[in-house]
A protein has these predicted regions:
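A beta-strand edge to alpha-helix "cap/lid" segment located at domain peripheries
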Residues: 1-29, 36-130
Length: 130
């Protein structure tokens, strides 16, 4: 059980490194076909929309990392809750947006055919303690 949790945590680290590099080939491998990402303002992105942000060059990171990582296994599913720190730039038809943020991230992994994939994630701004 501990080995599986470590595999998921390592995959989370590999995902973060791929986000930093804009490595769409690796991201395409690990994102589940029906992946859904929920952004910090509530918008949703499909797998292809998530990948296209890197493929078009719209999103470029200078720094991207995870810490405060906690992973729990539930059979063939795993939930990772962590802090995601990101610095970079996003550009689209609406303009240029500088990124320098920290989010609480919830990553949902599923095991399919003995391989773990990222099925979904949700980002929430860290605004302070309640």
């Amino acid at each position: 059980m501990q080995d599986e949790a470590q595999r998921v945590m390592t995959l989370g680290e590999d995902w973060a490194a791929a986000e930093l590099r804009g490595d769409t080939a690796f991201l395409r491998e690990i994102l589940a076909d029906d992946f859904v990402g929920v952004g910090p303002r509530g918008f949703t992105l499909t797998r292809e929309q998530w990948l296209s942000r890197h493929g078009t060059g719209s999103l470029r990171y200078e720094a991207f990392g995870l810490d405060e990582v906690q992973t729990r296994l539930f059979g063939d599913a795993a939930i990772t809750v962590c802090r995601q720190s990101a610095r970079g730039v996003y550009e689209d038809e609406n303009g240029r947006f500088d990124l320098d943020d920290q989010f609480r991230a919830t990553l949902v992994f599923v095991k399919q055919d003995e391989s773990w994939q990222l099925a979904g994630l949700q980002l929430s701004p860290i605004l302070g303690r309640p």
